[in-house]
Amino acid sequence: MDVTHLGHACLLVETDRVRLLIDPGTLSSGFADLRDLDAVLVTHEHPDHVDDAGVRALLASNPGATLVLDELTGARFADLDAVRVAHPGETLDLGERVDVLGGTHAPVYGDVPGCPNLAYLVGDGELLHPGDSLHVPQRPVHTLAVPIDGPWLKLAEAVDYVKTVRPESYLPIHEGELTDPAKYAGMLAAFTGP
């Protein structure tokens, strides 16, 4: 499995059977020209995870692709044919097994309303993309896409998340608003070990 980070929370996941794009949002780049996608997976409704116009253009350029998202976000794309509303606990066959986990966005602050948030476990635990949550799966994970910044997250929580999930490796994501993402990734590495 090859995973390419396209900025912020956007990942291109490629296997010998499938090409999946996760969270093509407004803080990501390089996804507009992608072709031969099998599915576009969105974790939740926030624009840094789903650029509505960009996703519509992407689907027009990838007519065989399925858009997978939660019910709330799905309402914005109800006019499209290839939309699949997913729910936690489901297992999808998108050419590769994708387990839908999670359920709720991590709390942001005070009375800021929450929203649905799906986490996606691709393959047999090869990659977990939690969206804006710190969802701990019930089985081993090879590569964890770990958020390192956001109004809902402290770096200490990211460290605890890595230590709890215990992936073989991790990929820092959700860094699009940082001025020096490498600094935060370095601090995460220092606290979690090699």
Describe the role of every protein-language-model region.
Residues 1-35, 85-140, 152-157:
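Core dinuclear metal-dependent hydrolase active-site scaffold
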Residues 4, 41, 68, 84, ...:
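Hydrophobic/aromatic beta-strand patches that form the interior of the parallel beta-sheet core
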Residues 18, 61-66, 165-169, 193:
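A short helix->loop->beta-strand "cap" motif at the edges of active sites that frequently abuts
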Residues 26-27, 45-47, 72-73, 87-91, ...:
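Short, acidic/turn-prone active-site loops that include or flank metal/cofactor-
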Residues 26-69, 142-145:
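Active-site metal-binding motif and surrounding structural segment of the metallo-beta-lactamase
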Residues 31-32, 51-53, 77-80, 139-140, ...:
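Short glycine-/acidic-enriched loop or helix-start segments at secondary-structure transitions
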Residues 55-106, 186-189:
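Portal/gating segments that form or line small-molecule/metal binding sites
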Residues 134-194:
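Cap/insert and terminal regions of metallo-dependent hydrolase folds
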